[in-house]
Swiss-Prot record:
Pfam families: Ribosomal_S8 (PF00410). Part of the 30S ribosomal subunit. Contacts proteins S5 and S12. PANTHER family: 40S RIBOSOMAL PROTEIN S15A (PTHR11758). It comes from the Bacteria. The keyword Cytoplasm does not apply. Keywords: Ribonucleoprotein, Ribosomal protein, RNA-binding, rRNA-binding. Belongs to the universal ribosomal protein uS8 family. It comes from Tropheryma whipplei (strain Twist). The keyword ATP-binding does not apply. This is Small ribosomal subunit protein uS8. InterPro entries: Ribosomal_uS8 (IPR000630), Ribosomal_uS8_CS (IPR047863), Ribosomal_uS8_sf (IPR035987). GO terms for molecular function: rRNA binding; structural constituent of ribosome. GO terms for cellular component: ribonucleoprotein complex; ribosome.
């Protein structure tokens, strides 16, 4: 059976693993998912990620990040633009998540960017998700 929204599936797996304090979560891999994991790592929401080449497909293993008192680095992850309703933002109207405490992940002509990076470059795009 095919998956309707692979990104929502990835975010749900991360949220569920994060909720029960798992150290790692495994999702089917794609270039977009690897790019999102890379962006989350650069922003400090996850520890690391790796791609495992298994047959029939590749797997993306994401190491979740917690504080010394088991506090979550990634408190929330929400899918914004969905297959049934795409959400786009102009460069002049980019979203701000929790007053700048979170990030919006945008798919732009310059690749995947956070809302602050897109503001600096002056580009808009599809708002894929919010992370805080």
């Amino acid at each position: 059976m095919t998956m309707t929204d692979p990104l929502s599936d990835m975010f749900s797996r991360i949220r569920n693993a994060n909720q029960v304090l798992h150290k790692k979560v495994t999702v089917p891999s794609s270039r977009l998912k690897v790019s999102i994991a890379d962006l989350l790592k650069r922003e400090g929401y996850i520890l690391d990620y790796s791609v495992i080449d298994e047959h029939p497909g590749q797997l993306l293993v994401i190491e979740l990040k917690y504080g010394p008192d088991k506090s979550r680095a990634l408190v929330g992850l929400k899918r914004v633009s969905k297959p049934g309703l795409r959400v786009y933002a102009k460069s002049s109207n980019l979203p701000e998540v929790f007053g700048g405490l979170g990030i919006a992940i945008l798919s732009t002509s310059s690749g995947l960017l956070t809302c602050s990076q897109a503001r600096k470059k002056g580009v808009g795009g599809e708002v894929l998700a919010y992370a805080w």
